[in-house]
UniProtKB/Swiss-Prot annotation:
One of its GO terms (molecular function) is protein-membrane adaptor activity. GO terms for biological process: tail-anchored membrane protein insertion into ER membrane. Required for the post-translational delivery of tail-anchored (TA) proteins to the endoplasmic reticulum. Acts as a membrane receptor for soluble GET3, which recognizes and selectively binds the transmembrane domain of TA proteins in the cytosol. The gene is GET1. It is a multi-pass membrane protein. This is Protein GET1.
Amino acid sequence: MPSLLITVLFLNVIIYVINTVGAATVDGLLWLLYIKLPTGTSQIAREQRHMKREVVQLKHEMSSTSSQDEFAKWAKLRRRHDKAMEAYEAKNNELTQSKSTFDMTIKIARWAATSGLMLFLQFWYSKTPIFTLPPGWIPWQVQWVLSFPRAPMGTVSIQIWGGACATVVALVGDAMRASLAYVSKPKIDRIKLGATMEGKEGKKRQ
């Protein structure tokens, strides 16, 4: 079943990417995209940013105004600042509650679309072979392991295929990360060396 074979491989790649990047990072990016959409939450986010700018501006004006020489003006700014701060905190709490609900929804959806789907496929297709091995190619003991737990003898079960995919994806991913780190390291060393040489030349000129 090629479609099931590819689906399991694709799911393992997605799970590895999420675990490598970090679920919190993925959730943060999705939140930034969500508040750009024309929704009620995006309206709350825009109002929160506007109120924050207003609070900062009023605080700056208060700092620039003398409470002794211009007390009337300073007191008026203080009242406006306190009122704006109260409105900002209320709006910020509303946005925080919306984000908490969004984070919980995303966590459930992410689990259902990755690990949850993988568990469902392993249960539903536990008797379905991913592919069939050539007759007599390997000993029956190994065939039994590869067909574990419920696939026909002489085939590879979805559980074994999923474990193999997870292992290979992790090995390939780690190898790619190590290669990128090795390639980028000489560039960083050259930048540091160039900065050191420029510093020494500057000292000699002085």
